[in-house]
């Protein structure tokens, strides 16, 4: 099987080199430069530059720009309430609270399966020792060497 594949590949390569198999040609219309050169950044980024909305009077009239206030973690003295709640802030805070329990470490449930260490138990309690089962022998023990040492 390998020989057949090898021979077929060699025949195809030889025919291609000899010119018997026509090489695939791309029409001239299809030869398009896909990547812009590094020396022409205007073409790469586009010739038109969009100005920010503050400088464009038409957009400011349609969409008034409100600069959002930054939320700070500083505590305000009593008597001063919270400032105005920006639109979307409440939803953001609810999302943060919702994800808080997911992002926190999982609770420790080891005490359900393992007793606390002796230092944490406080007073010392008597230890319960498990006694092995004792077999009371009456008379001499039977010789069982033949089980472990076959002859």
UniProtKB/Swiss-Prot annotation:
It is found in: Secreted; Endoplasmic reticulum. The keyword Iron-sulfur does not apply. It holds the Pfam family PRAP. The keyword Secreted applies. Residues 1-20 form the signal peptide. It comes from the Eukaryota. Interacts with isoform 1 and isoform 3 of MAD1L1. Interacts with MTTP. This is Proline-rich acidic protein 1. It comes from Homo sapiens (Human). The lineage of its organism: Eukaryota, Metazoa, Chordata, Craniata, Vertebrata. The gene is PRAP1.
